[in-house]
UniProtKB/Swiss-Prot annotation:
The gene is lipB. It comes from the Bacteria. This is Octanoyltransferase. Substrate binds at R96, G97, G98, Q99, I100, T101, Y102, H103, A168, L169, G170, G181, L182, S183. It comes from Burkholderia lata (strain ATCC 17760 / DSM 23089 / LMG 22485 / NCIMB 9086 / R18194 / 383). GO terms for molecular function: lipoyl(octanoyl) transferase activity. PANTHER family: LIPOYLTRANSFERASE 2, MITOCHONDRIAL-RELATED (PTHR10993:SF7), OCTANOYLTRANSFERASE (PTHR10993). GO terms for biological process: protein modification process.
Length: 252
């Protein structure tokens, strides 16, 4: 599968309702929260509750989570992309854009709860900023990665695994605010990806950083990723709560 470093032409974004809030109010610093190892359902419910309760004064947050094994299917997703019905991994239908993906131990999941109007961000611009943050994060570990036209996410740029997917992206926009986000594969059991057509693409190879011979620590990668996300959202001088609690994560 050949990959070219081009801008995406479609994005897995679900949009509902009309934007609300004040677009002229400056965006406060992003608060970063490490929520620990948490079931997908708990994170999903918390994201929706947070977004529903937002006011014009609610700060933006990035949540870093590691999930037990779970498949998630986007709101317009095709269930036939789950190839093994009795895999033992639960399937959760969700309201983000995109098709089916897998979350599990050894993967960083970052949820971006942002007021897009306040940040004066169009959805496509947000997607680009997220993708750039992942590309920059991987580059910090000497891994070259690219976007792929028509297939949102981040892909290996060259080598034996050229074209393999290493990060997935899916968002929901409600009342002008985003939730859901991205997942980056650090050191995982990749076998559950074989039971699906990842993001709806049959035969798409999925890799992690370990597959690319990078012995990266989950915490280090998470710190790098969140720094790049915040820098891309607010500029390199943006203030944010340092996610000290990430140090509690165990790679065992």
């Amino acid at each position: 599968m050949s990959v070219s470093p081009v801008s995406i032409v479609s994005t897995p974004v679900a949009v509902s309702a009309s934007p609300a809030g004040s677009p002229d109010q400056p965006a406060p610093p992003v608060t970063v929260r490490w929520r620990g190892v948490e079931t997908y359902e708990a994170s999903f419910d918390a994201m929706r509750a947070f977004t529903d309760a937002r006011t014009a004064d609610t700060g933006d947050e990035i949540w870093l989570v590691e999930h037990p094994p779970v498949y998630t299917l986007g709101q317009a997703g095709d269930p036939s992309h789950l190839l093994v019905a009795d895999s033992g991994v639960p399937l959760v239908k969700v309201d983000r854009g995109g098709q089916i993906t897998y979350h599990g131990p050894g993967q960083i999941v970052a949820y971006l709860l942002l007021d897009l109007r306040r940040r004066k961000l169009m959805v496509r611009t947000l997607v680009t900023k997220i993708e750039e943050a992942v590309i920059e994060t991987l580059a910090a570990y000497n891994l070259a990665s690219v976007r792929k036209a028509g297939a949102p996410g981040i892909y290996v740029a060259s080598g034996v695994h050229e074209g393999a997917k290493i990060a997935a992206l899916g968002l929901k926009i409600r009342n002008g605010c985003s939730y859901h986000g991205l997942s980056l594969n650090v050191k995982m059991d990749l076998r559950p990806f074989l039971a699906i057509n990842p993001c709806g693409y049959a035969g798409l190879e999925t890799v992690d950083m370990a597959s690319l011979e990078v012995a990266a620590d989950w915490n280090d990668v998470a710190h790098t990723l969140v720094r790049r996300l915040i820098a891309n959202l607010d500029g390199a001088s943006a203030a944010a709560d340092k996610p000290q609690a990430l140090e509690q994560h165990s790679n065992d």
